């Protein structure tokens, strides 16, 4: 159990760092930051392979750890003070699932299978086309 939690934390930190360093590169013109950013994203992918099982429960648990890690990153790395109203705002609605109707709603007039879009791809933000 402890190994799995540490794996989730390491994966979350690698993912956040892999996105944060390119942000710093763009905002602060630090060209050397792209190398550790690439290494961090490679580590992120490598850590995902180590997960004990590819099931919904595993990824849901990782998602919770990722969100907690992101809040800790905001507080201690970005220096943003977190308050209860801030934690229960838009992000809190997504965490509690209240936002699912807006995020997963089909686009105008398209209904899942009729549109030729595989809705399973929406979980990663990359819908795929089915061949007919």
From Swiss-Prot:
Topology of this chain in the membrane: Multi-pass membrane protein
Signal peptide location: none
Any one Pfam family match given in the protein's UniProt record, by short name: UPF0060
Superkingdom, taxonomy of origin: Bacteria
Transmembrane segments: 5-25, 32-52, 60-80
InterPro entries for this protein: UPF0060 (IPR003844)
Keywords: Cell inner membrane, Cell membrane, Membrane, Transmembrane, Transmembrane helix
Compartments where located: Cell inner membrane
A GO cellular component annotation in the UniProt record: plasma membrane
Family membership noted in the UniProt record: Belongs to the UPF0060 family.
PANTHER family: UPF0060 MEMBRANE PROTEIN YNFA
UniProt name for this protein: UPF0060 membrane protein SG1469
Upper lineage: Bacteria, Pseudomonadati, Pseudomonadota, Gammaproteobacteria, Enterobacterales
């Amino acid at each position: 159990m402890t190994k799995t939690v540490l794996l989730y934390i390491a994966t979350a930190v690698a993912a956040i760092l892999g996105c944060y360093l390119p942000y710093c590169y763009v905002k602060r013109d630090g060209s050397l930051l792209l190398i550790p950013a690439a290494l961090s994203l490679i580590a992120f992918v490598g850590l995902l392979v180590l997960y004990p099982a590819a099931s919904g429960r595993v990824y849901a648990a990782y998602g919770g750890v990722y969100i907690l890690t992101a809040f800790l990153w905001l507080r201690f790395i970005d220096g943003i003070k977190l308050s209860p109203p801030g934690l229960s705002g838009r992000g809190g609605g997504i965490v509690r699932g209240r936002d699912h109707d807006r995020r997963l709603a089909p686009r105008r007039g398209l209904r899942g299978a009729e549109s030729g879009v595989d809705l399973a791809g929406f979980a990663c933000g990359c819908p795929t086309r089915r061949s007919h």
